[in-house]
From Swiss-Prot:
Positions bearing carbohydrate: 38
GO cellular component: extracellular region
Superkingdom to which the source organism belongs: Eukaryota
Pfam families assigned: UPF0669
Family stated for the protein in its record: Belongs to the UPF0669 family.
Keyword tags: Glycoprotein, Secreted, Signal
UniProt organism field: Nematostella vectensis (Starlet sea anemone)
Protein name, as recorded: UPF0669 protein v1g209471
Signal peptide start and end residues: 1-23
Classification via InterPro entries: UPF0669 (IPR031420)
Compartments (UniProt record): Secreted
Taxonomic lineage from the root: Eukaryota, Metazoa, Cnidaria, Anthozoa, Hexacorallia
Amino acid sequence: MQGRYSAPLFLLLWLFFLHGTLCEQVLQTFTGEIGAGNYTYFTLNREGEITLILESTEGDADLYISQNVAKPDYENYDLQSSTCGQDVVTIPVEFKRPIGIGVLGHANSPLSKYTMTVVVDYGTGMAEDKNRWYSASEEGGEPQEESLIWMIFVGILKIIFEILL
């Protein structure tokens, strides 16, 4: 009985993975560090639904987003995430561009180090312009382009790993 369902299940999982990989793509990943109580600002010009994933690797960095303010902070923002660890914010396609992005180093951490990943959802009907999307107005990390082929390869490895466990 098990073999009867394993092929359709694998095909369904593969199609689900393929859909997610083709509709969403990592635009850039970069690292940075920021002192307690300080902000690093970025500007997002790219159209479409964009998800920002801020992973604090040391200390605690928080994310503030605004469609109206170029330098959002903890009092002036439209979207924010201030959790300990991973902060995720999805910017709707309807938000006016340019978007102001602020990364705050939490006051309880003398130095916060972070990795920011920018993911675009091509399923929302956005333009196919693949130019760089940001400009740093203070300190920032070095951006790295992520290849679609690399993302597919990593996804396949994740599926194989999940099946083996």
